[in-house]
Amino acid sequence: MSTKSQVTRRVRTSIATPEDGVHGNNQHKGILDPHLSVLEMLDRQDGDGAGQVEEGAVMTVGKRRVERSLHHSISESWQAIKRSDYSFLSGTHEVGAMHSSVGILSSSDTSEEEAEMRPSAHGTVHLGSSLASPMRQLLVEEDNSCAEEDDCQTVTISMPSSSTSLVMPKLSLSQRLGEPQLLLVGQPARKFWLTIPKCYQKLFDVKNLGMVTRWDVGQRYLAVMVVFHDIAQAPELLDGLCEKAPCPTVIPVCQKGQKSTLAALLKRYTARKCIRVYCSPIIMSNHHEKHRLLKHLHNLCNESESGYETELTVKSKKQHRRPRKKDAGPVALRHWAIWTASFTIGIGIGCCISLMATTRFTFFSSAPLPLTAVIPAQIPSSVASDKPPHRLVPHFYMLCKTTIRQLGTSLRLFFFEKFESRTWVHIFGMDLHSDDPLASLGRLMPLDFIML
């Protein structure tokens, strides 16, 4: 019983009295466990009734004080926790959240974390053994060092938690880059290929014409460069090329002295629309022209790889179009033609108007001239047949001259009789009394042109 009494005394000393609860600020605020009543019951067997009543009163007062202190400690328990005390918990929570967004966590991991973070009945948080493991400490240290030292790494780590995603487009290439795009055929094709720089050799694919298929000439290659060695075999080579594809694009290369003959042959094939000649024949030994051609073809192939239409890929559309009108002449010539036609039409209209307006004009003359008065001489009735034949030409000339003169006189008299008016002349107060009607008409005609 001595042992029980000692335990009872220790428990009683741990209970604060009302005076001690007010003045004892440095004492520990203990919590009564449920088994304290059992110890009191064991101790009650040796005591009397008065002692039991006193002990019961002490227990009641002590229990109320403990409950009040417990409520006060629980309400202010979050204020007693410093930021440094739970910083590792927040870091662990962030690492766990990031890990959950990246991977898949099992149910056991979640239960362990919940058990580790659950507070006990005493108001304290008990950390499990898993938080003290080296792996958890390593993750916390790495996260803190990344947040303090490098912001870029922090952004990189937090990227998996974002909801945005990048979708790469699907790319498809119909033709591999760097693949030969020009076909090189002919007997000295290999020799020509070896003489060009290596940067241009990748553009050509050297093959025999018999090994080339229709798909190669029509679809795979942009053009066919034909190297002619013997001009006598050129028609056979061109005919074989025309059989592979309809109207292929040909880049001719010939030997020295064959350019004119080959140009005439290609012109005949072009007229029949069997082939399309990309350029005039290039002499194989002319390095300047050859280099210019290769450089131009290299640029066209690069543009074709990048997706742009080139001169080699675009088919000729001039055959389907209507023939264009011929270009008009120079602007100055066109203006001169317009001005000349305008003046001519204006003068003609002015003359007609002036003649119609002067229909009432009459010349004051004593008497009209007879038709026979203006005839200078009589035309001989006949020509003697006995004259020599060399006199016929002068007589025929005199006959035509006299006829034209009489016709002019008759027309002049006819116009004098029809257009007899001088109304517009009287407006200006002019008096044209004259015995010579021809002189009067000569003065009137310039005035008519001025009136225009």
Swiss-Prot record:
Keywords: Autophagy, Membrane, Mitochondrion, Mitochondrion outer membrane, Transmembrane, Transmembrane helix, Vacuole. It comes from Eremothecium gossypii (strain ATCC 10895 / CBS 109.51 / FGSC 9923 / NRRL Y-1056). It comes from the Eukaryota. The chain crosses the membrane at residues 336-356. GO terms for cellular component: mitochondrial outer membrane; phagophore assembly site membrane; vacuolar membrane. Residues 1-28 are annotated as: Disordered. GO terms for biological process: autophagy. Mitophagy-specific receptor that recruits the autophagic machinery to mitochondria and regulates selective degradation of mitochondria. Mitophagy contributes to regulate mitochondrial quantity and quality by eliminating the mitochondria to a basal level to fulfill cellular energy requirements and preventing excess ROS production. Recruits ATG11 to the surface of mitochondria. Also promotes autophagy-dependent peroxisome degradation. This is Autophagy-related protein 32. It is a single-pass membrane protein. The lineage of its organism: Eukaryota, Fungi, Dikarya, Ascomycota, Saccharomycotina. Its main location: mitochondrion. It is found in: Mitochondrion outer membrane; Vacuole membrane; Preautophagosomal structure membrane. Belongs to the ATG32 family.
